[in-house]
Amino acid sequence: MVYRVYVEKKAGQTHEADSLLREIKDFLQIDTLSSVRVLNRYDAENIEEGLFTYAVNTVFSEPQVDDVSYEVPAGQFVFAVEPLPGQYDQRADSAAQCIQIISQGNRPIIRTAKVYVLAGELTEENIAAIKKHVINAVESREASLELPETLAVAYAAPETVATVDGFIALDDAGLSALLD
């Protein structure tokens, strides 16, 4: 079973969201944006429900400065950003290691994403510009807001790669023939 939790800084601690709001207004010139909320989303699998509940307040959040919720936050526009498949996710890896240490058992599968909740009078062009500003296509992509059935990633078996025997011994004519 996949468990999900959203973690957001409490009022007065929302430095990342406040900074992003200023960036969007200053650099993108989108003055109709009234607020930005930034939440960290954690999905966990291969973990017992009791351990997940314990980890919510010990691994995924700091109760003194974070608010926790289990539902997608309401807002005029919500989107999430996750690392690309194969991209190292330090937040997920650290959380998985901490939970493994706490449980003294197997390491759970953890996936994270940042969820952005925007409010204001925004056009489709404004939203596209904000997404382009927030999503670094080299390392991340827009994530689904739906809870997946599993976090396990299935990779297709690679096809057999043809080998070239005697490549080192090929002369110019042989290399030309190989390229054709």
Predicted regions, residues:
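Core nucleic-acid recognition elements
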Residues: M1-D180
